[in-house]
């Protein structure tokens, strides 16, 4: 069976122009035009998919087989194409019969040409073949358009699903063009999922919008950067000037009172002690210790002294922003409103990760660990699975932090920021684990953040974190926040 690409090649049909035409028609559709006007960032992300669409359409044409009747007609055309005049007239009745049997669009015109009285037989043969070729090109082009039209409708249906999902999530996720592009890529994995999954993402994004302080807290945490001092490799000698005090040879004037053993400058009170027999030994003791009160004469000389000393320069460098490893406490005390806040906070960090091209990994810790990779190609699917979880487990913070440290050892999680969301009502951490965390903070510049959802968290546990972010979910705090907004 002849493929469509082969037929295009033999008939010199430019399939690239037809693909360009079908894509332009697709982009000009009213559905896309309205969406592009509303979400310009997603438009730029969608336009990056055009080369992929062209490749897919070319592959579809390459794999397509032409109809049997068209293949039979083309093979008959090839046989006559190189035939001489005698053979052409000999086969002409069979050609007309075959064209009529397969119901070729060229059949009627072929009958008219065959009955036409043209004196030159070569002219009739040339005209017949030219008209037949035009008919074959027209049939092939029509088949092309039918095939591409089917692909366009299918692509438009998929785009409408992606546009609906991306458009709903655009306000919460698309902070810049990079975030819009990653959101568009991740929306591909959501096409076959239920409407409930999509509504779950929208529900938590709306909840986050209702909690502006929680959203602001995520912004502060996500955008924070630590600064580290980096010593320069080369040491330099720099002149250092100091002031030295040296005694002057010639005293000039009385400048105060001091302690010395200078008999000539004794104060009268000291001479009076010498005249009292009971205090005479006290006078000699002060004399030996040079503690007699005497007049101090101005005779000190101060001069500058410059020496070369080695100096090490330090440069302040901002630590590069790394990925997020978010540890979420799913114990019973983190249920209800705490659960909603924790999930919404994770969505806010995912927004920052998409905007800054950072990875985002979630670990749910109870008595075990459940992992979700939110920045993967199926990130939205992972996010809906995470949001559908319920918090009814226990609390094993030590095991979660140990797993986080192991995760940080992987190359792709270098310079990661660990974020622990909990009420921190948990058991005391082992000393060995605390020592590991301190080493990571001190020597490898890793940062550990605590997001406390309760005012009753244990200070001993939270002391290991670089930053502690408080978001009290108690009834009083919730009412105060609602009253303020």
From Swiss-Prot:
InterPro entries on file: Uncharacterised_CoxE, Uncharacterised_ViaA, VWF_A, vWFA_dom_sf
GO cellular component: cytosol
Cited CDD domains: VWA_YIEM_type (cd01462)
Compartments where found: Cytoplasm
Residue ranges the record marks as coiled coil: none
Keyword Zinc-finger appears in the UniProt entry: no
Origin: domain of life: Bacteria
The entry's keywords: Chaperone, Cytoplasm
Assembly behavior: Homodimer. Interacts with RavA.
Physiological role: Component of the RavA-ViaA chaperone complex, which may act on the membrane to optimize the function of some of the respiratory chains. ViaA stimulates the ATPase activity of RavA.
Family affiliation: Belongs to the ViaA family.
Name of the protein in question: Regulatory protein ViaA
Protein source organism: Photorhabdus laumondii subsp. laumondii (strain DSM 15139 / CIP 105565 / TT01) (Photorhabdus luminescens subsp. laumondii)
